[in-house]
Swiss-Prot record:
Binding sites annotated in the UniProt record for L-aspartate: T120, N124, D125
EC id: 6.3.4.5
The keyword Nuclease is annotated on this UniProt entry: no
Protein name: Argininosuccinate synthase
Quaternary structure annotation from Swiss-Prot or TrEMBL: Homotetramer.
InterPro entries per UniProt: Arginosuc_syn_C, Arginosuc_syn_N, Arginosuc_synth, Arginosuc_synth_CS, Arginosuc_synth_type_1_subfam, AS_cat/multimer_dom_body, Rossmann-like_a/b/a_fold
GO MF: argininosuccinate synthase activity; ATP binding
Pfam families reported in the protein's UniProt record: Arginosuc_syn_C, Arginosuc_synth
HAMAP family per UniProt: Arg_succ_synth_type1
CDD domains xrefs: ASS (cd01999)
Family designation: Belongs to the argininosuccinate synthase family. Type 1 subfamily.
Residues binding ATP, per UniProt: A10, Y11, S12, G13, G14, L15, D16, T17, S18, A37, G118
GO-annotated biological processes: argininosuccinate metabolic process; L-arginine biosynthetic process; urea cycle
Length: 405
């Protein structure tokens, strides 16, 4: 094994990372620093401290990263109206660069020469964690136990835990049949019956949202205030970024908004089925496009739409800390200088319906757009020359006998 003196482990306190902790201590004979991130996953993170202490860990980091997560990662991503493969709002992907950043910061603070994570060798997360780590600390060692050990089943992990007296919960609570990941932006569900792409997901799988059929029969109206492309208030009440997203999750969930069942293309080459709940993000995406519709120049809006799939792919595949993502982010952020105003939405049985938008920076001119008499604001005769000039190349081709049918 490589010479490792101290390693920072991304630690949840669950079975997998608890086994990894002991495995690192025994296999590398090194000191382990644990790092547990609170990203709004809705679980108690403090029990991870007690478990780490019981296993002899002396340096334990438990960080509340909810505000940083939404402010510096989720909000910048939504300024681009980011969607991967037409549907996925990147709830898992966008959390990984922050975890990688904090792993490296802690490594620098503690003098650690390595980091470790619990991502498997089949998934995208190993790539996301490690690309971020290498970008931020080129010489760091990365230990990925799932690519090294032979503990490739839950049974083997349990046996290892029992053999080494690793504290694990043994109560009667039924284990979820799905592999789940959660943060303030979403919950994901994979594995189990979802590995059959024809099998419908079960209703009791969903944790944040009611079914649209069981959502309230009365719609709810909601006003979102934007400043430079970010939401700063709901119904006139100013909120921090994390509070905005948490509130939208609650409201959206009550109305059955944000459920998704997709098959996506993983970076490592395979297709994977995932179900996602992203109520707040679904609302944010619809509202942001609405406020941009009146504040962005047409060509800027179209260019953003052309660049968005590339930007989404960079996030999905782990290139958040790459120079190309940073370049695109500067362009996206520059486009948001005038994205200010208020969007009014109607939430009803899984639907997010835009019912109004207004802004002091609006480019919508009712005097020009009206179907009524415009008082000379727009000379319709000008359209003839505009059309002829734009048709010129096609007329030339037709005159040359180039058939189009």
């Amino acid at each position: 094994m490589a010479d490792v003196n101290k390693v920072v482990l991304a630690y949840s306190g669950g079975l997998d990372t608890s086994v990894i902790l002991k495995w690192l201590q025994d296999t590398y004979n090194c000191e382990v620093v644990t790092f547990t991130a609170d990203l709004g996953q809705g679980e108690e993170v403090e029990p991870a401290r007690a478990k780490a202490q019981a296993m002899g860990v002396k340096e334990i980091y438990i960080d509340d990263l909810r505000e940083e997560f939404v402010r510096d990662f989720v909000f910048p991503m939504f300024r681009a109206n980011t969607v991967y493969e037409g549907e996925y709002l990147l709830g898992t992907s966008i959390a990984r660069p922050l975890i990688a950043k904090r792993l490296i910061e802690i490594a620098n603070e503690t003098g650690a020469d390595a980091i470790s994570h619990g991502a498997t060798g089949k998934g995208n997360d190993q790539v996301r964690f490690e690309l971020g780590a290498y970008a931020l600390k080129p010489g760091v060692k990365v230990i990925a136990p799932w690519r090294e050990w032979d503990l490739l089943s839950r049974e083997k992990l349990m046996d290892y835990a029992e053999k080494h007296a690793i504290p694990i919960e043994r109560h009667g609570k039924k284990k979820s049949p799905y592999s789940m990941d959660a943060n303030l932006l979403h919950i994901s569900y994979e594995g189990g019956v979802l590995e059959d792409t024809w099998t419908e997901h079960e209703e009791d799988m969903w944790k944040w949202t009611v079914s649209p059929e069981n959502a309230p029969d009365k719609p709810q109206y909601l006003e979102l205030t934007y400043r430079n492309g970010d939401i700063v208030a709901l119904d006139g009440v100013e909120m921090t970024p994390a509070t905005v997203l948490a509130t939208l999750n609650r409201i959206g969930g009550e109305h059955g908004i944000g459920r998704l069942d997709i098959v996506e293309n993983r970076y490592v080459g395979m297709k994977s089925r995932g179900c996602y709940e992203t109520p707040g993000g679904t609302i944010m995406l619809r509202a942001h496009r609405a406020i941009e519709s009146i504040t962005l120049d047409r060509e800027v809006a179209h260019l953003k739409d052309e660049l968005m799939p590339k930007y989404a792919s960079l996030i999905y595949t782990g290139y958040w800390w790459s120079p190309e993502r940073l370049m695109l982010q500067q362009m996206i952020d520059a486009s948001q200088a005038h994205v200010n105003g208020v969007v009014r939405l109607k939430l009803y049985k899984g639907n997010v319906i835009v019912t109004g938008r207004k802004s002091d920076d609006s480019l919508f001119d009712a005097n020009i757009a009206t179907f009524e008499e415009d008082g000379g604001a727009y000379n319709q005769a000008d359209a003839a020359g505009f059309i002829k000039l734009n048709a010129l190349r096609m007329r030339i081709a037709a005159n040359k006998g180039r058939s189009l049918f």
